[in-house]
Design a protein with these regions (language model features):
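Anaerobic metallocofactor- and corrinoid-dependent redox/one-carbon enzyme cores
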Residues: 1-164, 168-169, 173-197, 201, ...
Length: 327
């Protein structure tokens, strides 16, 4: 990607800071809890020691998108049994979805108390620029404070906060961690809001020129929370694999648009056809054995803004969604 496009991108940290402030201000009504680590790093617990809420998850999803996306609730999922849906649109989708929302920062720490591991998402990634992706995007944000979202069911040790603050070039007290357990109601909501990001990541994996993607939106059912991590992880993946719908608007040739549509849907994967929890178990819970092409929306429309032609591929699979959601 040329730096000409990213040169016009604003700060994802500046854009999302008002959303973080509002989340903290409304903590009581959102059923989330605010605390601090010993080094001053702020913790927003959205489901570990508190109930959390769907609205908290919706807001956290917009924070993940760097303040450049909107997530609204509706009943147009396309599934009679699971009408509750989330509609996602991102301004500057490459920056919002890949430069902020994508969970690409691997964070870990091991001590006598055990091991902590999480994949960080949110605008803090663009401050640290630790991933190769940011070299390709030609983007690095600048800010005095930041936020990272972690899909975890326990608090991060202070050492992780120190590492993140150092990598971001900020004081530890200016760092916020938002914690969203996968099995929580806030967790299933913020994962559903990743439906467009999943499509953007797949486009990147398919080596489609990112600068040719000019806009996009997605819709997906919101998975019922699972009672345990494995069930919840399966359901949140399946919501997008079997129920996610995305439309991308591209500035490309018709051949490029058609090829992207045909290659993107989840049913192009050799692992498609079973709930994700079953697939994961069959590979002895080794995530890296799962076909990477599986992680895609169920149905895709690619519209060429030059010619006005649209190309559609994939399917919505109600039977597999019902099986995954335990109906």
């Amino acid at each position: 990607m040329s730096n000409e496009l990213s040169a016009n991108w604003g700060s994802v940290n500046a854009a999302c800071q008002p959303l973080v402030d509002a989340l903290v201000a409304d903590a009581q009504t959102l059923q989330i809890e605010i605390s601090t680590l010993t080094n001053g790093t702020r913790i927003i617990d959205a489901g570990i020691n508190c109930p959390g809420s769907l609205e908290a998850g919706r807001r956290i999803g917009e924070i993940c998108m760097g303040g450049l996306g909107t997530a609204t609730l509706g009943t147009n999922s396309g599934f009679a049994n699971w009408p509750w849906s989330v509609n996602v649109h991102a301004r500057t989708p490459v920056l919002s979805c890949l430069g902020s929302q994508y969970a690409g920062w691997s964070l870990s720490h091991k001590d006598d108390n055990g091991q902590f591991f999480a994949l960080g998402s949110g605008p803090g990634r663009a401050l640290a620029g630790r991933e190769e992706l940011f070299k390709e995007l030609g983007y690095k944000d600048q800010a005095d404070s930041t936020v990272i979202v972690l899909e975890v069911d326990k608090f991060p040790p202070v050492e992780v906060a120190e590492k993140v603050a150092e990598n971001c070039g900020i004081k530890a007290e200016n760092l916020t961690f938002i914690l969203t357990p996968t099995a929580s109601i806030a967790g299933v909501m913020q994962i559903a809001i990743r439906v467009l990001e999943v499509a953007m990541h797949k486009a990147h994996e398919l080596h489609f020129p990112l600068e040719k993607i000019v806009d996009g939106y997605g819709v997906t059912p919101v998975a019922p929370p699972g009672g345990d991590f494995m069930t919840a992880m399966g359901r949140t993946n399946d919501a997008i694999l079997f129920g996610g719908q995305v439309q991308l608007f591209v500035n490309a040739s018709d051949d490029e648009a058609k090829a992207l549509a045909e290659k993107m849907p989840s049913n192009t994967s050799s692992d498609y056809g079973r709930p994700f929890a079953e697939i994961f178990k069959s590979y002895d819970y080794d995530f890296f054995k799962v076909d990477g092409m599986l992680f895609s929306p169920g149905k895709v429309i690619v519209t060429n803004v030059n010619t006005g032609k649209s190309f559609s591929a994939g399917e919505l699979n109600q039977a597999l969604l019902n099986q995954s959601f335990s109906l």
